[in-house]
A protein has these predicted regions:
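ATP phosphate-binding glycine-rich loop and adjacent ATP-lid/helix-beta elements
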Residues: 101-111
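N-terminal accessory segment detector
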Residues: 1-79, 84-102, 119-133, 138-140
């Protein structure tokens, strides 16, 4: 099986290609396509376990990516403070020109999370160093 880190450079190039040929909206459409068709594991975990499912999903993914992060899991709140995004780190070390909106691709999770009664907020703190905050709160 191919690890998620092996896709980073390919994703970056695809994002740049789509943007250059068809504009940023086409990149966003692609992210929505991924969300709709390739994140069934996240959707199942959120539907069945809520916040605990989010923690399970991202613990697995971020461990595989060797991310530096802090996760907070509460009854009604879930947060990931990304101290050093491995995707951004890999892109910075490579000779590839990083797609300027690369960090925005994490928005593809929003649609799934919000479908199950949660508010999803993402704050990109430093896109050059790969620092961001993802916050999910259960809606009342």
């Amino acid at each position: 099986m191919i690890s998620c880190t092996e896709f980073i450079l390919a994703y970056n190039e695809l994002f740049k290609f789509l943007h250059e040929k068809y504009g940023k909206d086409s990149v966003i459409d692609f992210w929505e396509y991924i969300s709709d068709n390739f994140l069934q594991n996240l959707e199942n975990l959120v539907r069945e376990k809520g916040i605990a499912g989010m923690a399970e999903y991202w613990t697995h993914t971020l461990t595989e990516e060797k991310a530096e992060y802090q996760m907070s899991v509460g009854e009604n709140c879930f947060e990931i403070y990304m101290k050093k995004c491995p995707s951004v780190g890999l892109l910075n070390k490579s000779k590839a020109v990083k797609y300027p909106h690369y960090c925005e691709h994490c928005i593809l999770y929003k649609k799934i999370i919000e479908k199950y009664g949660f508010a999803y907020e993402e704050n990109i703190i430093d896109k050059e160093r790969g620092i961001c905050l993802l916050k999910v709160v259960r809606k009342d």
